[in-house]
Amino acid sequence: SLKELQTTYFDYYLWHNIGGDRAEEGLDAMGLFEERFVNNGMMDFLNKKKEEGVIRNLGFSYHGDVAVFDHALRLHDEGKVKFDFVLIELNYLDWKHAKEINDYNTNAEYLYGEVAKRGLMAFVMEPLLGGRLSNLPDKLVAQLKRRDPDHSVASWAFRYAGTPKNVLCVLSGMTYMEHLKDNLCTYSPLRPLTNEEARFLDEHISKQIVDYKTIPCNDCKYCMPCPYGIDIPGILVHYNKCLSADHVVKSKADPAYNDARRA
């Protein structure tokens, strides 16, 4: 890696994807962690490289089983490895509602709290939750625009992710130039959320998002091409738009049912 990057050291080097499993091989998340980082001597090797200055800051990225996240931090507490940062998923929906989205998830409030109380820095992924927080239902967009008409819906999520004291870096996947310009506007310089703005997102916007029974599709198109020629993301995105605009008939008791059925 050093040769490919034409350098003699890494500023930030991480253990990637702890918490995942290889169930098809009979390895649960903890077993895979031990196999990849402990039993093969990798942890000792990286500790040595950190002592030599080849690695300036060592961390890990967390995805999956929270027991492995806790275990990795215990290794840090016990002095078996010295971490400087952790890459976690953090956004205003996952802060308190991650488990409501997926029971396998862990609330970002807990993840960040465990990182911060040890004085470690947090790198943030999924600040927009795969684009979901930049494509909100029309009613929620209107509420955000009433409070701040001059900034994008996405900027609320990016400001939320960048506000906590121990957040060092927020990762952003950008597709278009306007995304880059919006991010630069948001972070140059960052205008931290006030406590009142954070509560507005945590207690008002987030709860409404959870109550919308949309299909969790981010139009990533990973499911395409469909062998049957169906535009899967196109259908799901259209359904979600109809749902967010209250254009989905809920039952035969709905006065608009007959009209919708004819359509």
Regions picked out by a protein language model, each given a short descriptive name:
Residues S1-V124, L128, L136-L140, D148-P149, ...:
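Glycine/proline-rich, positively charged
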